[in-house]
Amino acid sequence: MDEKHIENLEESLGGYKEKILEVNKGTLEWDRDLIFKVRTQMGYEIEYDANLQWGCSPTETLLTSVAGCMAIDVFYFLKKMKADIKEFRINFTGVRRPDPPQYYKSIELVLNISGTGLTTKKLDRAISLSQNKYCSVYNALRKDIEVKVSYNIKDI
């Protein structure tokens, strides 16, 4: 992939990165027990439950947010690089510290992608752009968290 193509790739991000809200707002209300309901400014709802019976934990949503943010970036970049993606899945694992604050000490993301026109060079570039420049969630993590990203390509 030449430098001109990479510049065009980054310029094309205007399609979805321009829609990012500079200020995000929402509300969180206690529902019952240790269950809280969140409503985003766009009207989406999430339930947090410390006991994990009625909703996910805040740390789970952090982990899913890292995977989701990277997925959107990588998928978008690969499409711009003319890859025809048939399947895209990220398996993720987070290992937390046992003592408070029990933040993630390591996160592993394994991208499983199948399609045509997929190369390691394209995937490495898409992941690099996401990690180093575009994934807001990834870049909001503590710097001492070890994040490992790998992938499996199935060219069909």
Briefly describe each language-model feature range.
Residues 1-64, 75-156:
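Extended beta-strand/beta-hairpin segments
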